[in-house]
């Protein structure tokens, strides 16, 4: 996706600035006198300089003048006008460009009075990497830097893994990393269980492997029917030729393809590529449900809970969601909506400009597409009901946390810290965040710990180093609106708490922010339910075994532990799969393969004598010396 940057210019006329004493509607009226009748974006600022609202207009002068009129505003708009102390404006060439800029600014600035998309994150894709002679099938998230074909988005990693599993069975394309691929001297377990064709050890010729890759690509592009017919024809031919082994392999591949094309929770008949977006609102809260259909298949769904005030209408929420959701994602050719929105045509033009292809927004009234929308709307309604029930329960738990730790207010942000390592190796710290909405996974963070950070086999020093980095950054970013925790919970006992308090006092973090810092220590023999809690300057205490707050704090501690362990395992796995030959300049895939074929492993190459290295085909005397010297260092 190529992002289009609007050609715009800021209005920067000092003579147009209103008098410092003006505020609210009078201030806005003073701005209106100098505004042009052109499209653009406006920002409203409060007394503390924070952005209150970002809006766009086809005609800035007309749109902003509405705020100067003191009548007919909702309570939310009236409050916003009253708080306004400054405005800024950007003129754009078209209203479409204004809409794109507005969506971008709302996502980056998160103004108080705008409808905000929360829980936004990059979605996983399937990538067929083609920057290697044997293409690799893998999952991908983030920037598209690798050369290859991307397919998605998928609603979750689970949906990606399920599809990858099917693709392995049906097309036998490798999923291993390049370093593992280059290090193979015999086929791996995936080949033995018929999930890979074994290109790493030449069990399939390159042309035949490329054909498998092409078939996998066709499948992901929605050409599954033609592909299945071709495989069925080839299976019949193999049977007639009495080649029953080949026929059985083709049969298994056909079954794998059939499994993914028939196992759909929602019937996507007639919809090759579309997102179905539905909103349900109740009690001043909303859920937006999105189903992703690609290649005629349902690739999963996701729930979102935008932040907005009580007065927001469902169509208003839906329009704001669409603009922000596709701000950094490629939109499909068709977006089906549950509600009519006023600016559907303008949104379509903006998304077409950003995606560089035609994008249409449509609210179906009847037929198969309406059935898809209704099913999506049902999911939105059920998800919001669950969310509201969980929120009520969560509030009671947070009241308990407030009581246990003697907090002034109901905690809005709790940060929990843990670290993980094995005898100091692959050391890693982790922070998880919880609040009124439950676990806030888009705020989770991991901290790579190295020797210059702390003694990585010393839990106290690691915790101290991790919190020093976190608190230092917090002090720098606090004035820019960075979230400040109400409670910091450390997985550990009195020693860990003392180490962290040293850093907090050194940086003045408790005096500056009023953060409460506590520790949770496992009970004797690590028994759950016998945890002790520590607060600075107070004796340790325990909670009753059946106290719901105890269970909640255990869940927080366990989630931090899970997140830390997961990061440590990923780090350890990467270290184990990294090939030491990759670091030697001049050693490419062919030389690496020759060395591994000759010696059997990278460890044997490391221990090889210079004369043995010189005896390998394709390794010159100079290269042998280079390899030998590399490992000697």
From Swiss-Prot:
GO terms for biological process: nucleotide-excision repair; SOS response. CDD domains: GIY-YIG_UvrC_Cho (cd10434). InterPro entries: GIY-YIG_endonuc, GIY-YIG_endonuc_sf, GIY-YIG_UvrC_Cho, Hlx-hairpin-Hlx_DNA-bd_motif, RuvA_2-like, UVR_dom, UVR_dom_sf, UvrABC_protein_C. Residues 37-115 form the GIY-YIG domain. One of its GO terms (cellular component) is excinuclease repair complex. One of its GO terms (molecular function) is DNA binding. Belongs to the UvrC family. The UvrABC repair system catalyzes the recognition and processing of DNA lesions. UvrC both incises the 5' and 3' sides of the lesion. The N-terminal half is responsible for the 3' incision and the C-terminal half is responsible for the 5' incision. PANTHER family: UVRABC SYSTEM PROTEIN C, UVRC/OXIDOREDUCTASE. This is UvrABC system protein C. The lineage of its organism: Bacteria, Pseudomonadati, Pseudomonadota, Alphaproteobacteria, Maricaulales.
């Amino acid at each position: 996706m190529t992002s289009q940057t609007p050609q715009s210019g800021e209005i920067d006329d000092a003579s147009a600035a209103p008098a410092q004493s003006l505020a609210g509607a009078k201030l806005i009226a003073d701005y209106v006198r100098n505004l042009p009748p052109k499209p653009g974006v406006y920002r409203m600022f409060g007394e503390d300089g924070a952005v209150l609202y970002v809006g766009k207009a086809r005609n800035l002068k007309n749109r902003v003048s509405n705020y100067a009129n003191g009548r007919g505003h909702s309570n939310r708009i009236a409050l916003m006008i009253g708080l306004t102390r400054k405005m800024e404006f950007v003129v754009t060439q078209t209203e479409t460009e204004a809409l794109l800029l507005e969506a971008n600014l709302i996502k980056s600035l998160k103004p108080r009075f705008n409808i905000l998309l929360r829980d936004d994150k990059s979605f996983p894709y399937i990538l067929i990497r083609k920057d290697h002679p044997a293409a690799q099938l893998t999952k991908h998230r983030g920037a598209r830097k690798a050369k290859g074909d991307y397919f998605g988005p998928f609603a979750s990693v689970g949906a990606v893994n399920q599809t990858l599993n099917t693709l392995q069975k049906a097309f036998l394309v490798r999923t291993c990393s390049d370093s593992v691929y280059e290090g193979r001297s015999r086929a791996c377990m995936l080949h033995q269980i018929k999930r890979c064709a074994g290109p790493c050890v030449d069990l399939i010729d390159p042309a035949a492997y490329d054909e498998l890759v092409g078939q996998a690509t066709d499948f992901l592009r929605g050409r599954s029917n033609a592909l299945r017919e071709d495989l069925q024809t080839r299976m019949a031919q193999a049977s007639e030729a009495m080649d029953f082994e080949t026929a059985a392999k083709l049969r298994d591949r056909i079954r794998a393809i059939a499994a993914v094309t028939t196992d759909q929770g929602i019937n996507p008949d007639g919809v090759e590529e579309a997102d179905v977006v539905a909103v349900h609102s109740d009690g001043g809260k909303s859920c937006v449900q999105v189903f992703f259909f690609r290649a005629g298949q349902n690739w999963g769904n996701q729930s979102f809970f935008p932040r907005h005030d009580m007065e927001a209408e469902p169509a208003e929420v839906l329009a704001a969601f669409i603009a922000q959701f596709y701000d950094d994602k490629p939109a499909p050719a068709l977006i089906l909506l549950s509600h009519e929105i006023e600016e559907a045509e303008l949104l379509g033009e903006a998304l077409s400009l950003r995606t560089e292809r035609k994008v249409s927004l449509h609210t179906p009234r009847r037929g198969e597409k309406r059935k898809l929308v209704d099913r999506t709307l049902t999911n939105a309604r059920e998800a919001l009901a669950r969310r509201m029930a969980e929120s009520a329960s969560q509030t009671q738990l947070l009241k308990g946390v407030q009581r246990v730790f003697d907090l002034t207010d109901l905690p809005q942000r709790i940060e929990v810290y843990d670290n993980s390592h094995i005898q100091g190796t692959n050391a890693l710290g982790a922070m998880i965040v919880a609040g009124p909405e439950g676990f806030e996974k888009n705020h989770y963070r991991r901290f790579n710990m190295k020797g210059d950070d702390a003694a990585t086999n010393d839990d106290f020093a690691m915790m101290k180093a991790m919190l020093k980095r976190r608190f230092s950054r917090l002090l720098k970013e606090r004035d820019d609106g960075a979230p400040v925790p109400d409670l910091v919970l450390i997985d550990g006992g009195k020693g860990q708490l003392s180490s962290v308090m040293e850093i907090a006092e050194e940086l003045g973090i408790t005096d500056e922010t009023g953060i409460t810092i506590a520790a949770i220590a496992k009970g004797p023999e690590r028994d759950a339910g016998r945890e002790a809690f520590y607060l600075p300057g107070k004796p340790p205490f325990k909670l009753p075994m059946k106290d719901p707050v105890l269970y909640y704090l255990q869940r927080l501690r366990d989630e931090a532990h899970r997140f830390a362990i997961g990061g440590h395992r990923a780090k350890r796995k990467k270290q184990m799969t990294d090939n030491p030959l990759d670091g030697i300049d001049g050693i490419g895939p062919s030389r690496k393969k020759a060395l591994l074929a000759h010696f059997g492993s990278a460890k044997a190459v490391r221990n090889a004598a210079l004369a043995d290295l010189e005896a390998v085909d394709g390794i010159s005397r100079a290269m042998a010396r280079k390899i030998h010297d590399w490992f000697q260092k």
